A protein has these predicted regions:
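Catalytic domains of riboflavin
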Residues: 1-264
Length: 264
């Protein structure tokens, strides 16, 4: 079945072209496939396709900044769901919609919500579009379809938001990989995996920032270069103590030490 899985670079390319694709998560997680598209490309035809052929809940994946900009509160202040999916209250565009549930109305709500010029005055709650807040750090922090949709949209140079919809079988059961492959063949869609997206980001993202460097003198070894790095995902700081000059052509002995404030 691996031959039906496209490299994540191809999935990013599909997103950049405004095309829909299927994203699959791990078997030991939700073990499902979602129809995914960058939110800025989610027109009425796309919403109708998702409703007709995905059959799951059509959701709007947003980053934390946009959720705050829209003033959206979480659906639950005590999230006990299995995967802690961060649903916010549902939304509707304040202007231009009728009942709110039509494909056109939901597409309008989505385009209104993701606009750079939109704020909380442009939407109302509740509504027929279901935003989900992605974790800062994306799939490197949480390996969910929400984070994957936002990550891929960003990597594709799009508005950092996505529309996702779980794919279900005709009988109402969840589509697994064999069924997802048939859906992909039928509609000429590419399939990618969240696992490949995680690997891609690990290999290509620069998530460590060098924030400070100074020379210190210690009774244990004399002079050292003390370099402080910050992890951009969780803001944790890491300290490297370097003795002497590092030659990239030589093997350098490294010792990793877990900090204990009370004993060090």
């Amino acid at each position: 079945m691996k031959k039906y899985i496209s490299p994540i670079e191809d999935i990013i390319s599909e997103a950049s072209k405004g095309n829909m694709f299927i994203l699959v998560d791990a078997e030991d997680r939700e073990n499902e496939g979602d129809l995914v598209i960058a939110a800025e490309d989610a027109n009425a035809d796309v919403i109708n396709f998702m409703a007709k052929n995905g059959r799951g809940l059509i959701c709007l994946a947003l980053n934390e900044d946009k959720v705050d900009n829209l003033g959206l509160s979480l659906m639950s202040s005590n999230n006990k769901s299995r995967h802690e999916t961060a649903f916010t209250v549902s939304i509707e565009a304040r202007e231009g919609v009728t009942t709110g549930i039509s494909a056109y109305d939901r597409a309008l709500t989505i385009s209104t919500a993701i606009s750079e010029n939109t704020n909380s005055t442009d939407i109302v709650t509740p509504g027929h579009v279901f935003p989900i807040k992605a974790r800062p750090g994306g799939v490197l922090v949480r390996a969910g379809h929400t984070e994957a949709a936002v990550d891929i949209a960003k990597l594709a140079g799009k508005n950092p938001s996505g529309v996702i919809c779980e794919i279900m079988n005709d009988d109402g059961t969840m589509a697994r990989l064999p069924e997802l492959i048939e859906v992909a063949k039928k509609f000429n869609l590419k399939i990618g995996t969240i696992a490949d997206l995680i690997s891609y980001r690990i290999n290509n993202d620069h998530i460590i920032t060098r924030v400070h460097n100074e020379r210190i003198v210690s009774e244990f070894g004399g002079e050292w270069d003390c370099i402080v790095y910050k992890n951009d995902l969780d803001k944790a700081e890491h300290i490297a103590l370097v003795k002497g000059k590092i030659n990239s052509n030589e093997i350098i002995p490294v010792r990793v030490h877990s900090v204990n404030i009370f004993e060090d």
